[in-house]
UniProtKB/Swiss-Prot annotation:
GO biological process: pyrimidine nucleobase metabolic process; thymidine metabolic process
Coiled-coil zones: none
Protein name: Thymidine phosphorylase
UniProt family annotation: Belongs to the thymidine/pyrimidine-nucleoside phosphorylase family.
Physiological role: The enzymes which catalyze the reversible phosphorolysis of pyrimidine nucleosides are involved in the degradation of these compounds and in their utilization as carbon and energy sources, or in the rescue of pyrimidine bases for nucleotide synthesis.
Keywords: Glycosyltransferase, Transferase
Pathway(s): Pyrimidine metabolism; dTMP biosynthesis via salvage pathway; dTMP from thymine: step 1/2
Length: 440
């Protein structure tokens, strides 16, 4: 028998906690026998004293085990359970293509996703732009979709890692969100509860990233890879660029539209293609679905070219109660804003830098994101035809097309877009799309 205050005292004094102590405290959070004040105190001591790798693994496993851990054995599936998690960015619509692409190559992708908060978009919000799309199927329906289609994208239910929800809410109001051991446990508790064989992490770097510096992004990637592998899930991470909007669009319906056009081959933004392919390659290799990088890329290109990935996306939408002909008629189903017009720079020049976070907040100001978790979303608004770093802009070549529902919102977003983009006379050096692969 342990006392919560003694566990806090031990960590406060810089000592390592045992697996049993950590599990006791996390179960206490779940069972409401540990107070908010005690959660806050432990979070702050971890923030200042960090955690060893065994402590981090124990914390993650305890949070995972605070609720249901999915088990797929009874379905006798003939492929691995694999997933991807991104630390979030702007125009990061990779999940919508990646899930169907990997499923088309023989993987099973039980993706449990989140909503957008702050400048980052949320996969669930994007999917809810599709009429009827059900992000909370019951457990048997979720399992059936995985068995029949190979991929489902759903929201976190109350039975998955419930201790994390309470722990995170306390961290959010006590300035302890940006602790690497706590971020790692929060991300992985939910992902490992999916019952995965392998996971790939997409850790963003740059002006639109969750972590403010390259070094902190790298530290987080290494922590997640170390803890996930320590917990028995084969995991790699890619550090990818978020110094500009990843897709050509940012919003909800506009990103879904781009995802469908990507899958059907109508239009594939080169940077979005590179990141999506790189993440899919990791998933195929980790899941044993390809022999090497070239083999994985060939398989993935084949399912894009032959339409299998697009077909699986359509089947997933239909299985989750969206329209059965969504891929064929997406424009007739997705909501459109009342006003769509381009924004131009006030002078001509070459785009040398972007404040990607500010561009994400421009989408929020249009109504396409949330400042608070309870805010409603306007699915129709956003940015499209985003200019890229290094592009020349003038009175004919816009910075973006803004989709708004009134003139005032359009003007406010136009001012924000102009302010977020730096112009010069000489192109900046091209940044890599994928900076680094981390395996341990």
């Amino acid at each position: 028998m342990f006392l919560a205050q003694e566990i806090i005292r031990k960590k406060r004094d810089g000592q390592a906690l045992s697996e049993e102590e950590i599990r006791f405290f996390i179960n206490g959070i779940r069972d409401n026998v540990v107070s908010e004040g005690q959660i806050a105190a432990l979070a702050m001591t971890i923030y200042f004293h960090d955690m060893s790798m065994p402590e981090r693994v124990a914390l993650t496993m305890a949070m995972r085990d605070s609720g249901t851990v999915l088990n797929w054995k009874s379905l006798n599936l003939n492929g691995p359970m694999v997933d991807k998690h991104s630390t979030g960015g702007v125009g990061d619509v990779t999940s919508l293509m990646l899930g169907p692409m990997v499923a088309a190559c023989g993987g099973y992708v039980p993706m449990i996703s989140g909503r957008g908060l702050g400048h980052t978009g949320g996969t669930l919000d994007k999917l809810e732009a599709i009429p009827g799309f059900d992000i909370f199927p019951d457990d048997s329906a979720f399992r059936k979709i995985i068995q029949d289609v190979g991929v489902a994208i759903i929201g976190q239910t109350s039975s998955l890692a419930p201790a994390d929800k309470r722990f995170y809410a306390t961290r959010d109001i006590t300035a302890t969100v940006d602790s690497i051991p706590l971020i790692t446990a929060s991300i992985l508790a939910k992902k490992l509860a999916e019952g995965l064989d392998a996971l790939v992490m997409d850790v963003k770097v740059g002006s639109g990233a969750f972590m403010p510096t390259y070094q902190l992004s790298e530290d987080l990637a290494k922590a997640i890879v170390g803890v996930a592998n320590g917990a028995g899930c084969k995991t790699t991470a890619l550090l990818t660029d978020m110094n500009q909007v990843l897709a050509s669009s940012a919003g909800n319906a506009v990103e879904v539209r781009e995802a469908v056009r990507f899958l059907t081959g109508e239009y594939r933004n080169p940077r979005l293609l590179e990141v999506t392919m790189a993440l899919c390659v990791e998933m195929l290799l980790s899941g044993g679905l390809a022999q090497n990088d070239a083999d994985a890329r060939a398989k993935l290109q084949a399912v894009l070219d032959n339409g299998k990935a697009a077909e699986i996306f359509g089947r997933m939408v239909a299985a989750q109660k969206g329209p059965s002909d969504f891929v064929e008629r997406y424009d007739s189903y997705l909501p459109a804003a009342m006003l769509s017009k381009p924004v131009f720079a006030e002078r001509s020049g070459i785009i040398t830098a972007m404040d990607t976070r500010a561009l994400g907040m421009a989408v929020v100001s249009l109504g396409g994101g949330r400042r608070r978790a309870t805010d409603p979303i306007d699915y129709s608004v956003g940015l499209t035809e985003m200019a890229r770093l290094g592009a020349s802009v003038d009175g004919q070549q816009p910075l973006a097309v803004i989709h708004a529902n009134n003139e005032d919102d359009w003007q406010q977003a136009a001012d924000a877009v102009r302010a977020a983009i730096t112009l010069g006379q000489k192109a900046a050096e091209e940044t890599p799309v994928v900076y680094r692969r981390i395996t341990e």
